Amino acid sequence: MTHVFIDGSAGTTGLRIADRLSERHDIALITLSEALRKDEKARKNALNSADIAFLCLPDAAATEAVGMVENPHTVVIDTSTAHRVHPEFAYGFPEIGSLREKIVSSHRIANPGCHASGFIAAVAPLVERNLLKKDAFLTCFSITGYSGGGKKMIAEYEADEKGAYAAPRQYGLSGNHKHLPEMQTVCGLAVQ
């Protein structure tokens, strides 16, 4: 039996992971009550009792959670952006280069970003085969569903009084989007 703890199980990502794993008979979910979800001691105990710990947390909280893991056998899978380019974390995109071997042998895995994944799947093979220069000027356009904004955005869309959400809203146009470092690093692109 594999014991799994989802730190951040009440958020959009955590709820989806819990839902999928709950149907597995070979997995036992370690859960914390509502009162203990943010209790550091309870979280630390759950993290270190788990065979696999999913971090479904904001970046700062994910970094804090990794610091709580003392059990060398606990596999940590972080869904935040905090560790996607961290050298001690394998980037969880097995179709790219030697990443499959790194994922299999690692106890620290960074889950790829959804928007970054589309870009990486298209660009990394082109860079790897020298069909696209590492310093090429690229743009990326993607659209997310409302669940991509998490619980806050879902609540805004489902509220009785809705804002003007008839068309997509622009986001991340400043050239420093949070997924940019992983897109550049995994694809082997030059930082501009």
Spell out what each predicted region is.
Residues 1-171, 188:
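N-terminal Rossmann-like NAD(P) cofactor-binding subdomain of oxidoreductases
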Residues 172-192:
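Oxyanion-binding "anion nests"
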